[in-house]
Amino acid sequence: MATNAAAPPCPCYDTPEGVDILGRYDPEFAAILTRDSLAFVAGLQREFRGAVRYAMERRREAQRRYDAGELPRFDPATRPVREAGGWACAPVPPAIADRTVEITGPAEPRKMVINALNSGAKVFMADFEDALSPTWENLMRGQVNLRDAVAGTITYRDAARGREYRLGDRPATLFVRPRGWHLPEAHVLVDGEPAIGCLVDFGLYFFHSHAAFRSGQGADFGPFFYLPKMEHSREARIWKGVFERAEKEAGIGRGSIRATVLVETLPAVFQMEEILHELRDHSAGLNCGRWDYIFSYVKTFRARPDRLLPDRALVGMAQHFMRSYSHLLIQTCHRRGVHAMGGMAAQIPIKDDAAANEAALELVRKDKLREVRAGHDGTWAAHPGLIPAIREVFEGHLGGRPNQIDAAAGDAARAGVAVTEEDLLQPPRGARTVEGLRHNTRVGVQYVAAWLSGSGSVPLYNLMEDAATAEISRVQNWQWLRHGAVLDAGGVEVRATPELLARVVEVEMARVEAEVGAERFRRGRYAEAGRIFSRQCTAPELDDFLTLDAYNLIVVHHPGASSPCKL
């Protein structure tokens, strides 16, 4: 005889009023998405979302002025902040005095987090931003990974290799990079609106890990963060408010949280003093985010045919505007008593070619020697294999000192070196070629395909690439097409046009298919990536961020994930 058994209750997240979770339910995720942690995140959203909206509108307003011909400049209204000698940032916490080598990588996969913490670097920056594709699974597993890393319990078993991964005796100090202010989190709704992504990243991590971090590797300070994509000190002011609210709710002292700001937009280079001043109780210095800085240079001057970039490979730190940016950052940080961090070494070991591998390492050594001689206190590496070479360069130059903040050392500190607005805006020089267009397309399409498939940190042609790669590639292609740049095609001049790009995309897609194999090409999202990349490069107006355009393609909603369950 049949019986009508009651349906088992569906698993769902226990959410406070006004919060809805649209991501897939998972018991591990539920331990992160608790009622109290979500209430904390919702409180941040409600207090600061108005200020964030205002800041984003001011960004758009500034871009309209640049499009009309105005140049970025130092703000006359804040000259007293820049010129005042009577203020400094809070003293550097002992736990992060030595930051000579920092390794960066996504907060997920778990094995990668363990390897980075065990890499021998002084700091591991776990990334929720450019190195992570922000799928629901990646974001939540990243939170689980960081909670376990701070607790010292993170492990991973590779069943295929029969290998167990766990933390070593002296793991790197953890910094966390949340997303930029512009990115939403569509799987978390607060009062019916998508949450601000960075406040979800920050809020969940801080809520679950601040106490364990401070009692462990933070030595009564922390947690520590990297803050990306800012364009103005008003955006730093919002972070200041977020930090102060978090400290108050956690019952920890003001200034416990510390953050390094990535100077990776052209407008921000004119706001470095002001950014440090806003965050002076919470500052852990500034970092040269040089790849996104190049992207921002193109975006800022998108309407200016006199600002065309040469091939991406030629836009390095030898360019005057890039060298000036580095020198001003060092001067600013050391004047205010904080770290001036160098840029990324993106090379990865070349296992099957010893000569090529040594040549790549030599390029890294030269770049890092330039940085430490200029006055940088530390630098970034994308792969553990680079760390011994970088440590040798920095430690050899520093001679036992943890940094050179107080040493007045380096090229940037020489008397008479004054960086002007003209220095920071000098157009870069070099050739523009069809091969550059092809390389941008080949790399850009492959990165977008990987990002759509859930990978945000991608090895391509012996470099570890993140979203900055795709951004530089697509904005440079767009710039060349928009202004009809003349490109060198092996001694023949051709004009950049949509028709030329269409031919290049066709050829490069075939090349990528040959490189990765027909089956992987078919199963991957290469065709979709090619369409997105082509559309971005030929759009009448330049989109602010490629990742905003592509984000909806990785959002997967599960409407019954929040309480009360919807049966």
UniProtKB/Swiss-Prot annotation:
One of its GO terms (cellular component) is glyoxysome. The keyword Transferase applies. A motif (Microbody targeting signal) lies at residues 565-567. The active site is at residues 177, 466. Keywords: Glyoxylate bypass, Glyoxysome, Peroxisome, Transferase, Tricarboxylic acid cycle. Pfam families: MS_C (PF20659), MS_N (PF20656), MS_TIM-barrel (PF01274). InterPro entries: Malate_synth_C_sf (IPR044856), Malate_synth_sf (IPR011076), Malate_synthA (IPR006252), Malate_synthase_CS (IPR019830), Malate_synthase_TIM (IPR001465), MS_C (IPR048355), MS_N (IPR048356), MS_N_TIM-barrel_dom (IPR046363). Pathway: Carbohydrate metabolism; glyoxylate cycle; (S)-malate from isocitrate: step 2/2. SUPFAM superfamilies: Malate synthase G (SSF51645). It is found in: Glyoxysome. Its EC number is 2.3.3.9. Induction: By submergence in seedlings. Its main location: other. It catalyses: glyoxylate + acetyl-CoA + H2O = (S)-malate + CoA + H(+). GO terms for biological process: glyoxylate cycle; tricarboxylic acid cycle. One of its GO terms (molecular function) is malate synthase activity. Belongs to the malate synthase family. This is Malate synthase. It comes from Oryza sativa subsp. japonica (Rice).
